[in-house]
């Protein structure tokens, strides 16, 4: 181990003891897009013993510009991101354990994963999942690192339950969000800077150096050469529904878990269906073949229908590309599959 990590061990803030702690650590990465792949690669090379990745999507050609683990072969095969990431990370470091889950991040799927993790890295692309992470991290007392980037801008904040403001506190005071990678684009340097900060914060936490973390909200614009750190200690709220004295964890409630959602900027609707989940895969393929050519791998099915492109995952989710109307997406699935 010493030869592989020799340069890292020479960094006195880590050393041999810190390297051993990393080997015994477990990091959960929620999302395997640009931030998720950068963070997963960096932490795997650093020797974090167990890395768990959860992601609901598959590799597309537009991902290759900034999502560093993936290859053209992954895009051609429409490989689920979590599985492709696991394969590439295992080739980078065979000494560590990689777990991959091809499913949506919901309260049900995320809670058992967060309970096992020492640190959670936020690499999601939507507000709802971030707030789920926030509530679950508060509930399980798990530290996590928020991160987001779009265009040439990026931001991050480390959240330690019981010590720092949570994301719900922050969003009450600081407007965050708006544009997305799909609407405003993104350049890789913005991704790499946010991910580098997230990795550094994770290494500090995993090696027991909580005193070294960034105590604030950091935002920057790599194109316009701006960088700002905001002191957010004052935004922590005693009455916060997520981290206050009488927390109720609002984003863990069923009413905050929609069965269908428009994916921002992608002209795509995701539909979750228990009925779809119960149909045997071979039966589903048989039905779809009456409509057109079915492409399949171990994790998903793909078919074109009229002006729509439909991708069906093993966990009962379907992506209907070509619409941003939930009713239309449900209607398409009803015609194609009979739901």
From Swiss-Prot:
Top EC class, one word: transferase
User: Which pathway or pathways does this protein act in?
Assistant: Cofactor biosynthesis; molybdopterin biosynthesis
Q: Which GO terms describe its molecular function?
A: ATP binding; metal ion binding; molybdopterin-synthase adenylyltransferase activity; nucleotidyltransferase activity; sulfotransferase activity; thiosulfate-cyanide sulfurtransferase activity; ubiquitin-like modifier activating enzyme activity
Q: How is the cofactor bound?
A: Binds 1 zinc ion per subunit.
Binding-site residues for Zn(2+), renumbered to this chain: 166, 169, 240, 243
List positions binding ATP: 34, 55, 62-66, 81, 125-126
Q: Catalytic activity, per the record?
A: [molybdopterin-synthase sulfur-carrier protein]-C-terminal Gly-Gly + ATP + H(+) = [molybdopterin-synthase sulfur-carrier protein]-C-terminal Gly-Gly-AMP + diphosphate
What SUPFAM superfamilies would the database entry show?
Activating enzymes of the ubiquitin-like proteins
Give me any GO biological process, just one. Mo-molybdopterin cofactor biosynthetic process
Cofactor (UniProt): Zn(2+)
Q: Which GO terms describe its cellular component?
A: cytoplasm; cytosol
> Organism's domain of life?
Bacteria
Keywords assigned: ATP-binding, Metal-binding, Molybdenum cofactor biosynthesis, Nucleotide-binding, Nucleotidyltransferase, Transferase, Zinc
EC number annotated for this UniProt entry: 2.7.7.80
**Oligomeric form and interacting partners:** Homodimer. Forms a stable heterotetrameric complex of 2 MoeB and 2 MoaD during adenylation of MoaD.
Family that this chain belongs to: Belongs to the HesA/MoeB/ThiF family.
- Function of the molecule: Catalyzes the adenylation by ATP of the carboxyl group of the C-terminal glycine of sulfur carrier protein MoaD.
The protein in question is named: Molybdopterin-synthase adenylyltransferase
């Amino acid at each position: 181990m010493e030869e592989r990590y020799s340069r890292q061990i020479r960094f006195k803030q880590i050393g041999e003891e810190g390297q051993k702690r990393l080997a015994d650590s477990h990091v959960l990465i929620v999302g395997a897009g640009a931030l998720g792949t950068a963070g997963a690669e960096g932490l795997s090379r650093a020797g974090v013993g167990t890395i768990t990745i959860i992601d609901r999507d598959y590799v597309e050609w537009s991902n290759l510009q900034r999502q560093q683990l993936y290859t053209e072969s992954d895009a051609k095969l429409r490989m689920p991101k979590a599985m492709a990431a696991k394969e590439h990370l295992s080739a980078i470091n065979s000494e560590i354990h990689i777990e991959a889950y091809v499913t949506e991040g919901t309260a049900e799927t995320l809670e058992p994963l967060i309970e096992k993790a020492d640190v959670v890295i936020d690499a999601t692309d939507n507000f709802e999942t971030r707030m789920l992470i926030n509530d679950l991290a508060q509930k399980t007392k798990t530290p996590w690192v928020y991160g987001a980037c779009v265009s040439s801008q990026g931001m991050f904040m480390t959240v330690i339950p019981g010590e720092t403001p949570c994301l719900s506190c922050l969003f009450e005071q600081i407007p965050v969000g708006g544009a997305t990678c799909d609407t405003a684009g993104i350049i890789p340097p913005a991704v790499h800077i946010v991910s580098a900060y997230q990795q550094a914060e994770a290494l500090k936490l995993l090696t027991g150096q909580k005193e070294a973390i960034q105590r604030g909200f950091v935002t920057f614009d790599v194109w316009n050469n701006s960088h700002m750190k905001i002191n957010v200690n004052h935004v922590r709220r005693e009455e916060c529904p997520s981290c206050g004295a009488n927390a109720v964890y609002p984003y863990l409630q069923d009413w905050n878990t929609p069965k269908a959602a428009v994916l921002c900027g992608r002209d795509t609707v995701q539909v979750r269906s228990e009925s779809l989940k119960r149909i045997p895969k071979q039966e589903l393929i048989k039905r779809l073949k009456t409509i057109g050519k079915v492409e399949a791998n171990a994790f998903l099915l793909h078919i074109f229908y009229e002006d729509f492109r439909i991708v069906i995952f093993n966990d009962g989710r379907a992506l209907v590309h070509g619409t941003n109307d939930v009713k239309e997406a449900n209607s398409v699935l009803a015609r194609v599959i009979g739901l």
